[in-house]
């Protein structure tokens, strides 16, 4: 058992190193040699014990970003419902702190590759569908609890919120000073405040 735990810890360490290099250098410039060197390995072949090739490493890296985001959402929304839970979900997804900024830089890099790589696209699509389902569930709770006016088109509301969150990933990368963490949180609060009045 300890050997399995060690193997998994090393895989995660390699993935986290990959995130850092992608965030600093871009996905195309983060070579297996650079990743191995940053991990303290003399040769990139050592990485093959954990990932057969760069594509497999990138896929695992994207999967772990989505997994960690989902873990934060689950922790942040535990014991909450309706608009309170929806607020926490939005705040966990947007890149508004140093950790999520790194994740966003990496995720945006993956989105470009996902246009031509089915496996990456499937991971991103699964995450979006999961978040959309959560948003719709929290909206239904908000309606039930009279936190917001009846929603004529909850699907459209869910799509609007998701596009705000995904859009903030892009605009915060292009202009981080203008689209700061506080600015992102303000935009999320504005969107949720509109729900409490009318849709």
Ranges and model annotations:
Residues 13, 20-56, 60:
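Helix-turn-helix
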Residues 7, 11, 62, 66, ...:
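Amphipathic, non-transmembrane alpha-helical scaffold segments
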Residues 101, 121-129, 143-199:
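Hydrophobic/aromatic-rich alpha-helical bundle segments in the mid-to-C-terminal region
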Residues 60, 73-104, 154-161:
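Hydrophobic alpha-helical connector segments
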Residues 10-19, 35, 61-65, 69, ...:
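Generic hydrophobic, amphipathic alpha-helix propensity
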Residues 85, 98-122:
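Amphipathic alpha-helical segments used for helix-helix packing
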Residues 1-9, 199:
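N-terminal intrinsically disordered/low-complexity leader segments
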Residues 52-56, 77, 81, 98, ...:
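Residues in soluble alpha-helical coiled-coils and helical-bundle/repeat scaffolds
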